[in-house]
């Protein structure tokens, strides 16, 4: 039983159900929400406690009851002073019931975990309800992180939350927070509104286009090399590129962080360093994307540096050799990777005119070391 449930303050009928001596049939009836004489708040407290029972049947019955509470019971409970553990159970079951979310946010004993669960599962409206409670956001910065990383939360809401964090010197643990924080200083912050703004619709439409985009599963890329050796967008990608081009820097950063493979592979080539870096920092980026990017001469040295610093990516032999061969890779990183290349590739690189003189020399030195050894 949760420590914050004060059984002695519950009515006698509820205390009897929660006592160790209570008969199994009585507990099972209570798990179904049947507790004669108990108020709605007390019923929900008891059912929430039983949902954590060691008895699988009892716990399953209680959880099913919580998920389908009759409106009078649920509404009555939402006016009571519920313990934090009960608020947590309701947050798990009703994260997108906007009436429930509104009531839970007003409760003094709501905890961080309950807020995080609601933020994680929030739809657009629920996200707005949570985010507008600035006092709770400042007390629980991890909830800001959850809302930012939830694609269903409006773009304008995410911007407001980043601005709030920056204004109060909060350091958020989101992948590209440094970039988002720098970008937000130059953005117009929109007030909360009932209807989504143009920026919100744009962000959603871009993500939908990106999700529908069909890219090669093994070698995904939004670009192809033309006859002159220059990268250009594939025709199928042009509508998505047009949407992304309309975005502000902060919008692009979030799209690069949370978006589809197509969005990342376009935005990693963005001329704005903040946007491109956010794309390569995305937790959604996979090894095959890193391999494509590390071979591109259209990305910045900042992007290549981030790939070189990522141990998960540099486990890939293809990423290693791409970074060594790419003239835009900072020399410090490319030379560190040379000892990890195969002898056959070292011999090819030692004679290649497509690598810089410094890399060619470092490769030859590595071969010489191996020959002497």
Language-model-detected regions and their locations in the chain:
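Alpha-helical scaffold segments
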Residues: 1-373
